[in-house]
């Protein structure tokens, strides 16, 4: 069957009250859908994207050669089967792919927010999505699925909207961002802030799309290191040297160096640096226990079936961080959860690239 890819943007004029006490109004949310919603709306699956992801999770636009970021996972006969499920993925507020973010025009001034944009949290991102679903007359969904920052959103849904989803599937994530991950984000943030072409946030976005931003590229290289693992780097690159470079050339490169350069500099031409600063801030301050006496108290609110998936060699969100959630659920007597640690050498990116290692688990969770 057809993927039935549709893209929409909803405009909201009511204020969005943020966790910080700030207000965002008006605001837009861009989202994409796949499959067909059944009559009683019982087949809705929400997919939440990661830091640099977007609402475009699957399929191809007419002018595209590269499909959505989870195309191998969403579609006819795939783990999230669009022959069965109606899938919705929205771009989070604070991002740069259609939903309101720091480079959106501030009402009524018609100038980009830039630093006037309020800090948003993962909880705020989820709240905005919940408002979107109310607009769409969707008040309960079959499941919410997300990896990395998407997993953070899924877990926030479980705690703050406990009656919204039958099932929550969280992959490669954590209950609170730890110093190791915050440190990688700090390198990226400082690299952006100290690039003179960033112009203290008053850069020309069109110029950056052409030229990129070298500071952001360096920060992204650091990020890529945290997404991989020692094992995956060794397997992918070894000590291979670029065939066109001389071993004794000062700037001759190993293949791993070339990989980091390509991905780092290419990234800066399609992702906005202010959005990167705001979203990494949201990730850094993420903590499921905020507002509760403990993580256990927060998890007592969960009524959905909870499926936790970690990856053995994940450097960014270590597998024991997910195990801590499972352990707390055990302690409070929650019987409606499962935890698996997937053996993978791909590190954090395994949830994007090594789908065969866990897709059957997700299928079983959705269909069970």
Curated annotation (Swiss-Prot):
Q: Which GO terms describe its biological process?
A: homoserine metabolic process; methionine biosynthetic process
Q: Name one GO molecular function term.
A: homoserine O-acetyltransferase activity
Compartments annotated for it: namely: Cytoplasm
Residue ranges of domain AB hydrolase-1 in the record? 43-354
The record ties this protein, via InterPro entries, to: AB_hydrolase_1, AB_hydrolase_fold, HAT_MetX-like
| Gene3D superfamilies membership | 1.10.1740.110, alpha/beta hydrolase
Question: What would be one Pfam family of this protein?
Answer: Abhydrolase_1
Q: Which residue ranges traverse the bilayer?
A: none
This protein's superkingdom? Bacteria
User: Is this entry keyworded Signal?
Assistant: no
Catalyzed chemical reaction(s): L-homoserine + acetyl-CoA = O-acetyl-L-homoserine + CoA
The keyword Plastid is assigned to this record:
no
Name the major location. Answer: cytoplasm
- GO cellular component terms, semicolon-separated: cytoplasm
UniProt-annotated catalytic positions: 148 (nucleophile), 314, 348
The record's EC number reads 2.3.1.31
Q: Where does substrate bind?
A: 220, 349
Pathway this chain belongs to = Amino-acid biosynthesis; L-methionine biosynthesis via de novo pathway; O-acetyl-L-homoserine from L-homoserine: step 1/1
Q: List UniProt keywords, sorted A-Z.
A: Acyltransferase, Amino-acid biosynthesis, Cytoplasm, Methionine biosynthesis, Transferase
Q: What class of enzyme is it?
A: transferase
Subunit-level organization:
Homodimer.
Write out the similarity annotation.
Answer: Belongs to the AB hydrolase superfamily. MetX family.
Q: What does this protein do?
A: Transfers an acetyl group from acetyl-CoA to L-homoserine, forming acetyl-L-homoserine.
> What is the designated name of this protein?
Homoserine O-acetyltransferase
Lineage in the entry?
Answer: Bacteria, Pseudomonadati, Campylobacterota, Epsilonproteobacteria, Campylobacterales
